[in-house]
């Protein structure tokens, strides 16, 4: 069966067999394959009812994946939002993992840099690194003060 002959359900099942997708991502991918928007909407409702597609499950897996990469809450929340996950579902997924954000920021910083830096320019570079990873100001300050305590 070629992609042109595949039903929206066939395409959705094929996509979901590889990994979870948010409802929004799945809708975009099915629309790109030429399926009618009305067919896609009813299919996504049916898949959710059957437990085959869940934004909550997608968000939980996404959060675990991003935490293992050393990313902060702000970046994870923004990426989930870009994938069409609601703020409430994103918040619940982050709370479900309950990571120690300060420890995670310290680990990410110590892994990337071997010292806090000798001058303000080097310290600013380290702070920008953590901010780009999605850590907030308090977490960045904590990491700059404590990231290398166990390595000395």
Curated annotation (Swiss-Prot):
Principal place of residence: cytoplasm
Pfam families in alphabetical order: RecX_HTH1, RecX_HTH2, RecX_HTH3
Alphabetically ordered keywords of this record: Cytoplasm
Locations listed in the record: Cytoplasm
Tagged with keyword Methyltransferase: no
GO cellular component: cytoplasm
Classification via InterPro entries: RecX_HTH_1st, RecX_HTH_2nd, RecX_HTH_3rd, Regulatory_RecX, WH-like_DNA-bd_sf
Domain of life: Bacteria
GO biological process: regulation of DNA repair
Family label: Belongs to the RecX family.
Function: Modulates RecA activity.
Cited PANTHER family: REGULATORY PROTEIN RECX FAMILY PROTEIN
Record-linked HAMAP family: RecX (MF_01114)
Entry protein name: Regulatory protein RecX
Annotated source species: Chromohalobacter salexigens (strain ATCC BAA-138 / DSM 3043 / CIP 106854 / NCIMB 13768 / 1H11)
